[in-house]
Amino acid sequence: MIIRSPEPEVKILVDRDHIKTSFEEWARPGHFSRTIAKGPETTTWIWNLHADAHDFDSHTSDLEEISRKVFSAHFGQLSIIFLWLSGMYFHGARFSNYEAWLSDPTHIGPSAQVVWPIVGQEILNGDVGGGFRGIQITSGFFQLWRASGITSELQLYCTAIGALIFAALMLFAGWFHYHKAAPKLAWFQDVESMLNHHLAGLLGLGSLSWAGHQVHVSLPINQFLNAGVDPKEIPLPHEFILNRDLLAQLYPSFAEGATPFFTLNWSKYADFLTFRGGLDPVTGGLWLTDTAHHHLAIAILFLIAGHMYRTNWGIGHGLKDILEAHKGPFTGQGHKGLYEILTTSWHAQLSLNLAMLGSLTIVVAHHMYAMPPYPYLATDYGTQLSLFTHHMWIGGFLIVGAAAHAAIFMVRDYDPTTRYNDLLDRVLRHRDAIISHLNWACIFLGFHSFGLYIHNDTMSALGRPQDMFSDTAIQLQPVFAQWIQNTHALAPGATAPGATASTSLTWGGGDLVAVGGKVALLPIPLGTADFLVHHIHAFTIHVTVLILLKGVLFARSSRLIPDKANLGFRFPCDGPGRGGTCQVSAWDHVFLGLFWMYNSISVVIFHFSWKMQSDVWGSISDQGVVTHITGGNFAQSSITINGWLRDFLWAQASQVIQSYGSSLSAYGLFFLGAHFVWAFSLMFLFSGRGYWQELIESIVWAHNKLKVAPATQPRALSIVQGRAVGVTHYLLGGIATTWAFFLARIIAVG
């Protein structure tokens, strides 16, 4: 008798021809909702249409159908990203001075947009050097392209076409995986398989292929560019890939092929996989051989990580087991039940992902200046400032989004009957202690951090500089930060073998890298001024967290409104009969949190902008004397509120205010217009619904008199709609104002 092991069953994980493709739905706005599909009776209809179009939870309660819609929408999102990317590369190919910039990146500025001569707008085409007139761009694409080894506009053109093809492919995939082969719920919930594929596939093989590209294409091309070879003389990428001898001339170990790899003699490869630390003095960017090494190491880590979870082959970890084993002495059931939450509530899953991604984006913002990854990025001050500001804003929005979806999870997906004594339940049960302590911390930080500034303003006003908190009077040195800096500055010899410099020049150690007479990076000194503003950062961040966390922890119930869960995620007040219950919905906490997020990030980018202009960015003479843009005034000026207003906001706004008649004048107009958008928001935030409804009735009366009254009844915005419109214009106006202020300033002086 032969005993065979049972054949593994092949599970069918898709439904074929799940929903027929039809354009008829497109002709019926609001087809996803019975009420909205009826068409407009009042103007509120258009608001509801926009609010619910992508709220898939409101279309159906079937988790499988919701999952499929989200999955399909992701492909649409990817398609838009590829389309955008294609546009960026197309502008580089068609309208830019990329080839000229490549030949002389220190004297020529990057530009990829030339304004047509209509009503005199061609004034915006500034002279960026090399005889090219256009708008100076600050996105960092030129530096990225050089690091990738792109040497001609034709290559950019081909890449743009490739991205368009991918965009079309993504659109097709979105349609295919909803209409033709829609995955079943089991497929979406198979987390081990998902982790294996995302870790080993996306991150592992993704990093490996990038490392391969860096080694075989980017490194040799950049080596030629750094040596001053004309880009047109450099061999094409495929020649390096196909002809090993060509690479061996630059990196001798290539002649030995894979032998050192299999004989474990890996140090042979140290000519193109390095561990130097610091910056390349020619380009002011990280050593590209360091970054190739980094991506190879990351690839190996993720390829291993992608083989850790149990799928069809009965070996490896199961995520449920891992989570349920997480029990501490004070955490009751620990993470029991978390697996079920994360596989049945996409809001809970999204919330975690947004929190992680938001934090990571802010980490990216800081690394982009401290460890500038691309050639000639560090000396392009406009791009440095833009990249920092951009990643800070994006990170802030993602973190607020994390709180929003955590609250939606609490309202829509949390089932208190099945959750007892797990970590989340325990947090909810002592939420009063958490929130009241956090509130105390906010009050303490607010009064003390602001109090230090007010003290300084008062002493300064009374002419008593010796009694101020400053580096020259009463010092409040950030000793812990200085200790961390010092540790890192001394670390290279003791940690990585062969590392000649620390991970970042900002740590200290006296090294300075300048490219073409401009400072790329140098050790950043920290003093009393930084100590003060860092406590403002602590204050604003804690208040943001207080608002957002309160919204999540009290999303379902509170002492004021015990049945809050029944009212939903967003509601204006708890009915007409109960005063003092407005702005308590989870949505309102997100709304209020956005303002404090805006506060937090504004202080951060102001701090960064001024600190870099004062202590880092500037020019260096032949004698090695550094002249900073604002001459090191941060340490003495930023210790008073008056100093921030006078020497930062007012002094540095002169470029944007005086930009009329120059190529920077668009920023002057934006500065004006964005202030207007910001002020416009206050109209929505400070006036109530009744005021507008009264006004509307009067206007409708006039229309009736003239027999031009519309069939759709005009309605004032609801309370929630007014707040949404208000906060949108507030943030948009504020961010665009800052953008115009920063860019006009840094393009003029940088």
From Swiss-Prot:
**Leader sequence residues:** none
UniProt binding sites for chlorophyll a':
675
Q: Where in the cell is it found?
A: Plastid, Chloroplast thylakoid membrane
For this UniProt record, give its keywords in alphabetical order, as a comma-separated list.
4Fe-4S, Chlorophyll, Chloroplast, Chromophore, Electron transport, Iron, Iron-sulfur, Magnesium, Membrane, Metal-binding, Oxidoreductase, Photosynthesis, Photosystem I, Plastid, Thylakoid, Transmembrane, Transmembrane helix, Transport
Catalytic activity reads: reduced [plastocyanin] + hnu + oxidized [2Fe-2S]-[ferredoxin] = oxidized [plastocyanin] + reduced [2Fe-2S]-[ferredoxin]
Q: How does it sit in the membrane?
A: Multi-pass membrane protein
Domain of life per record: Eukaryota
Q: Where are the transmembrane segments?
A: 70-93, 156-179, 195-219, 291-309, 346-369, 385-411, 433-455, 531-549, 589-610, 664-686, 724-744
Alphabetical list of InterPro entries matching this protein = PSI_PsaA (IPR006243), PSI_PsaA/B (IPR001280), PSI_PsaA/B_CS (IPR020586), PSI_PsaA/B_sf (IPR036408)
**Cofactor, how bound (note):** P700 is a chlorophyll a/chlorophyll a' dimer, A0 is one or more chlorophyll a, A1 is one or both phylloquinones and FX is a shared 4Fe-4S iron-sulfur center.
GO MF entries: 4 iron, 4 sulfur cluster binding; chlorophyll binding; electron transfer activity; magnesium ion binding; oxidoreductase activity
Stored Gene3D superfamilies: Photosystem I PsaA/PsaB
Question: Where the protein is mainly located, per its record?
Answer: plastid
Give the binding site residues for chlorophyll a: 683, 691
| Residues reported in the UniProt entry to bind [4Fe-4S] cluster | 573, 582
Question: GO CC terms for this protein?
Answer: chloroplast thylakoid membrane; photosystem I
The record lists phylloquinone as bound by 692
Q: Which residues are connected by disulfide bridges in this protein?
A: none
Q: What is its EC number?
A: 1.97.1.12
Q: Which Gene Ontology biological process is one annotated for this entry?
A: photosynthesis
Quaternary state and partners of this protein?
The PsaA/B heterodimer binds the P700 chlorophyll special pair and subsequent electron acceptors. PSI consists of a core antenna complex that captures photons, and an electron transfer chain that converts photonic excitation into a charge separation. The eukaryotic PSI reaction center is composed of at least 11 subunits.
PANTHER family reported for this sequence: OUTER MEMBRANE PROTEIN, OMPA-RELATED (PTHR30128), PHOTOSYSTEM I P700 CHLOROPHYLL A APOPROTEIN A1-RELATED (PTHR30128:SF19)
Identify its protein family: Belongs to the PsaA/PsaB family.
- Protein's job: PsaA and PsaB bind P700, the primary electron donor of photosystem I (PSI), as well as the electron acceptors A0, A1 and FX. PSI is a plastocyanin-ferredoxin oxidoreductase, converting photonic excitation into a charge separation, which transfers an electron from the donor P700 chlorophyll pair to the spectroscopically characterized acceptors A0, A1, FX, FA and FB in turn. Oxidized P700 is reduced on the lumenal side of the thylakoid membrane by plastocyanin.
Stated name of the protein: Photosystem I P700 chlorophyll a apoprotein A1
The upper taxonomy is:
Eukaryota, Viridiplantae, Streptophyta, Embryophyta, Tracheophyta
Task: Name the gene.
Answer: psaA
